[in-house]
UniProtKB/Swiss-Prot annotation:
Organism: Mus musculus
Record keyword Glycoprotein present: no
Phosphothreonine PTM positions: T298
Record note on modification: Monoubiquitinated by CBL and CBLB after EGF stimulation; probably on its C-terminus.
Protein's recorded name: SH3 domain-containing kinase-binding protein 1
N-terminal signal peptide: none
Region Disordered, residue ranges: 221-242, 289-309, 372-485, 511-650
C-alpha cells in the first residue's frame, strides 16, 4: 500500500479530484502516468497531482514508529514492598536499531517563522527529511521544525556508530532497569505521611529474581506472624500464573502491619534488606560514578573530528559563469565561492559542490581551486529562500485544466539525468563546449591594402564619371561620320585603359572649362607659308573631304602637338595647376570647341569639321609617324574663317608626353604581371588536380577493401 504526505495545498477543480492540505496523508494510492495519482483521504477517493505530495517510503514509516515509545501502564507496588514491577519499561533505543541522519549546527540561526528551529553552534539535530531545496526538517531538544541546510554540517555514518556504541556502553555500565527518581511509581505511605521511598534511588531487578522475591514476600505476608495472629493473610493472594495481584489494602483494627506495630513510639525505619536484595540493588554512588565519565568524554571525539573536517574543507572560486543545463547542476556566476564536496564524480571533468544551500555538479574548468588556508567563516552563508508558495503551482495547474478537457498535470521539473553511463557523456560535452566562455576574441585585423607594385599601382580606383552626352552632329557627307567613329573608338579604348589603372590622373570635366572672350592666335601664324600647299583647315568643305590629301598626306609631330595644345587651351587658361589630362578628354574637347563666328555660310558645318579635324590628326599620327607636312598653317588660301589658337606653355606639352610614356610603361608592366599570375594559377590548378586524383584513387581503394571484407 503506497502512502504519500501532502506538501502543498490543492483545491479540487473537478468532481473527481481531491482537495488536499499540507500535512495530510493520502492512502491506497494508485500511481498513473500523466502526473495524476489516485488515492483516498478521509474516506473519499479521487485524483490529485503527484508533484504536490511526497511519497512515504517504508524506511520513513519505521522511523516514525520507532520514535513512538511504547506506553505501558505503571503497576502499583505492594504496600510493604520496595520492589518495582517488571513491566515497567524505560524508553530506550534498541541495540539493533540505527539512528537517523544527524547534523551539527555550524552557524547560529534565529527562527523567522513558528515552524522553524532555533539553532546554536554545536547543537546536534536529527534529520527527519529534506522538505525543500535548502530547507530540512529535523528534531532538536524534542522540538520538530524546519532549518536551513547551509547552516549545518552533516555528520557521517562513523560518528553515528560512535554515538550508538557509546550509548550501548552506558547501558551496559548500569544495571538493567535503571529508573530515575522522577519516574518512580507511586510509593506506599507509612505513618505520619512519610514515604518508604523517600531519599532513595532504586533500580529494577532482573525479571527472574524479581519473581522469586515476590513469592518470598507473599509467603511471609500470607503466613503472617505469630505475634500478629496471622490476620494479614486475608490481604494478599497470589494468582495461578505466579504473578502477584495487587489488591487494595483493607484497614484493620490491629496495630501495625505484618510483624506487628514495629514503629510504635519510634521513628519509621525501613525493613532491613536481605543479602540477595543488596546484590540486586547497586548503590547509587557506583552507578553515578560509572555513568558520568562516558557522558563527559562523549562530545570530545566528535568535536575534534568536526574541527578536523572543517579545517580540511576545500573551496573554489568561479572564474567563468555557467548556466545549469540539468536539475542536478549548479548555476554559478563569476566570483562565487563554492564549497567543494566531492572531486571524484562519475563524470570526468565535473565536481560536486554546494552554493547558497543548493548542492549540484559543475564543470571543474570553470572554477579555480582556492588555497587550503582560505577562511570562509567570515562569509556567513545567506539564508536560503523560504519554501515557495504553492499558489504558483496551483495557478499553473488550474489554468491549464480550464482550457483542456482531459486532466493535464501542472508543470513538473525534468528528471535528473543519469550520468552513470559513459556513452551519454559525449552528448553532454558539446553543450559544455557551447556554453563554456572563453577569453574575449581578438578583434579582426584591419584589411590590408593591396600589394603595390614598383610603379605605385593604386589599390582602389575612383568611380568613373558618367560620360557627357554629345550633341547631334550635322554631317554634310556620309564619310565624315566614319572618321568621327574612328576617333571616338580610339579615345574610348584609351580612356578605358587609363581609368582602370590610375587614380593619379585628374578627371577634369567639361564643366570646369571657362569660356574666354579674348581672341586666340595660333602659334604658327608667324611661320612662313608654302605656296601651292593646302594647310589643314578648321572647316572642311565637301570638296576637301573628298580629296585624298587628308588621309594620304603625312602628318608631322609638330602638328599633332599643336592640335593637342589647341584642344586644351581652355583647361590651361582656367586651371594652371592641372597636371594630367586623359587622351579621351583631348578628343572630346576638340569636338566641344566652339568655332569663331564668321561671315561665311560654311560656318554651319563647323561641328562636323571639328570632329573630323580632331579625329584625322590622331589617326594619321598613329599610322604615319615621323613624316612632316609641307605646310603647318591652319589658314586656307580661299579666305575661309580662321581660328586663332591659344598660346600654351611648353611645360604642359612635356608633361603630357611624360604621362603618355608612363602610361605605356604601366600597361606593359601590368601585362607582364598578368602573364606571371596566370602561369602561377595554372601551375596551382595542375597541382590541385593531381591531389584530387590521388585522393580519388585512395577512396576507391578503401571502398574496394571494405567491399572485400
Amino acid at each position: 500500500m503506497v502512502e504519500a504526505i501532502v506538501e502543498f495545498d490543492y483545491q479540487a477543480q473537478h468532481d473527481d479530484e481531491l482537495t488536499i492540505s499540507v500535512g495530510e496523508v493520502i492512502t491506497n494510492i494508485r500511481k498513473e502516468d500523466g502526473g495524476w495519482w489516485e488515492g483516498q483521504i478521509n474516506g473519499r477517493r479521487g485524483l490529485f497531482p503527484d508533484n504536490f505530495v511526497r511519497e512515504i517510503k517504508k524506511d520513513m514509516k519505521k522511523d516514525l514508529l520507532s520514535n513512538k515509545a511504547p506506553e505501558k501502564p505503571m503497576h502499583d507496588v505492594s504496600s510493604g514492598n520496595a520492589l518495582l514491577s517488571s513491566e515497567t519499561i524505560l524508553r530506550t533505543n534498541k541495540r539493533g536499531e540505527r539512528r537517523r541522519r544527524r547534523c551539527q549546527v555550524a552557524f547560529s540561526y534565529l527562527p523567522q517563522n513558528d515552524d522553524e528551529l532555533e539553532l546554536k553552534v554545536g547543537d546536534i539535530i536529527e534529520v527527519v527529511g529534506e522538505v525543500e531545496e535548502g530547507w530540512w526538517e529535523g528534531v532538536l531538544n524534542g522540538k520538530t521544525g524546519m532549518f536551513p541546510s547551509n547552516f549545518i554540517k552533516e555528520l557521517s555514518g562513523e560518528s553515528d556508530e560512535l554515538g550508538i556504541s557509546q550509548d550501548e556502553q552506558l547501558s551496559k555500565s548500569r544495571p538493567e532497569g535503571f529508573l530515575p527518581a522522577s519516574l518512580l511509581p507511586f510509593p506506599a505511605h507509612g505513618a505520619k505521611g512519610k514515604t518508604t521511598f523517600e531519599g532513595t534511588i532504586l533500580y529494577r531487578a532482573a525479571p527472574g529474581k524479581t519473581e522469586g522475591h515476590r513469592r518470598y514476600y507473599s509467603l511471609r505476608e500470607t503466613t503472617g506472624s505469630e505475634s500478629d495472629g496471622g490476620d494479614s493473610s486475608s490481604t494478599k493472594s497470589e494468582g495461578a500464573n505466579g504473578t502477584m495481584a495487587t489488591a487494595a489494602i483493607q484497614p484493620k483494627k490491629v496495630k501495625g502491619v505484618g510483624f506487628g506495630d514495629i514503629f510504635k513510639d519510634k521513628p519509621i525505619k525501613l525493613r532491613p534488606r536481605s543479602i540477595e536484595v543488596e546484590n540486586d540493588f547497586l548503590p547509587v554512588e557506583k552507578t553515578i560514578g560509572k555513568k558520568l565519565p562516558p557522558a563527559t568524554s562523549t562530545p570530545d571525539p566528535s568535536k575534534t573530528e568536526m574541527d578536523s573536517r572543517t579545517k580540511t574543507k576545500d573551496y573554489c572560486k568561479v572564474i567563468f559563469p555557467y548556466e545549469a543545463q540539468n536539475d542536478d547542476e549548479l548555476t554559478i556566476k563569476e566570483g562565487d565561492i563554492v564549497t567543494l564536496i566531492n572531486k571524484d564524480c562519475i563524470d570526468v571533468g565535473w565536481w560536486e559542490g554546494e552554493l547558497n544551500g543548493r548542492r549540484g555538479v559543475f564543470p571543474d574548468n570553470f572554477v579555480k581551486l582556492l588555497p587550503s588556508d582560505f577562511d570562509k567563516e567570515g562569509n556567513r552563508p545567506k539564508k536560503p529562500p523560504p519554501p515557495s508558495a504553492p499558489v504558483v503551482k496551483q495557478g499553473a495547474g488550474t489554468t491549464e485544466r480550464k482550457h483542456e478537457i482531459k486532466k493535464i498535470p501542472p508543470e513538473r521539473p525534468e528528471t535528473l539525468p543519469n550520468r552513470t553511463e559513459e556513452k551519454e557523456r559525449p552528448e553532454r560535452e558539446p553543450k559544455l563546449d557551447l556554453q563554456k566562455p572563453s577569453v574575449p576574441a581578438i578583434p579582426p585585423k584591419k584589411p590590408r591594402p593591396p600589394k603595390t607594385n614598383s610603379l605605385n599601382r593604386p589599390g582602389a580606383l575612383p568611380p568613373r564619371r558618367p560620360e557627357r552626352p554629345v550633341g547631334p552632329l550635322t554631317h554634310t557627307r556620309g564619310d565624315s561620320p566614319k572618321i568621327d567613329l574612328a576617333g571616338s573608338a580610339l579615345s574610348g579604348i584609351l580612356d578605358k585603359d587609363l581609368s582602370d589603372r590610375s587614380n593619379d590622373i585628374d578627371l577634369e570635366g567639361f564643366d570646369s572649362v571657362i569660356s574666354s572672350t579674348e581672341k586666340l592666335s595660333h602659334p604658327t601664324t608667324s611661320r612662313p607659308k608654302a605656296t601651292g600647299r593646302r594647310p589643314p583647315s578648321q572647316s572642311l568643305t565637301s570638296s576637301s573631304l573628298s580629296s585624298p590629301d587628308i588621309f594620304d598626306s603625312p602628318s608631322p609631330e609638330e602638328d599633332k602637338e599643336e592640335h593637342i595644345s589647341l584642344a586644351h587651351r581652355g583647361i590651361d587658361v582656367s586651371k594652371k595647376t592641372s597636371k594630367t589630362v586623359t587622351i579621351s578628354q583631348v578628343s572630346d574637347n576638340k569636338t566641344s570647341l566652339p568655332p569663331k563666328p564668321g561671315t561665311m555660310a560654311a560656318a554651319s558645318s563647323g561641328p562636323a569639321s571639328l570632329s573630323s579635324v580632331a579625329s584625322s590628326p590622331m589617326s594619321s599620327s598613329l599610322g604615319t609617324a615621323g613624316q612632316r607636312a609641307s605646310s603647318p598653317s591652319l589658314f586656307s588660301t580661299e579666305g575661309k574663317p580662321k581660328m586663332e589658337p591659344a598660346v600654351s606653355s611648353q611645360a604642359a606639352i612635356e608633361e603630357l608626353k611624360m604621362q603618355v610614356r608612363e602610361l605605356r610603361t604601366i600597361i606593359e608592366t601590368m601585362k607582364d604581371q598578368q602573364k606571371r599570375e596566370i602561369k602561377q594559377l595554372l601551375s596551382e590548378l595542375d597541382e590541385e588536380k593531381k591531389i584530387r586524383l590521388r585522393l580519388q584513387m585512395e577512396v576507391n581503394d578503401i571502398k574496394k577493401a571494405l567491399q572485400s571484407k
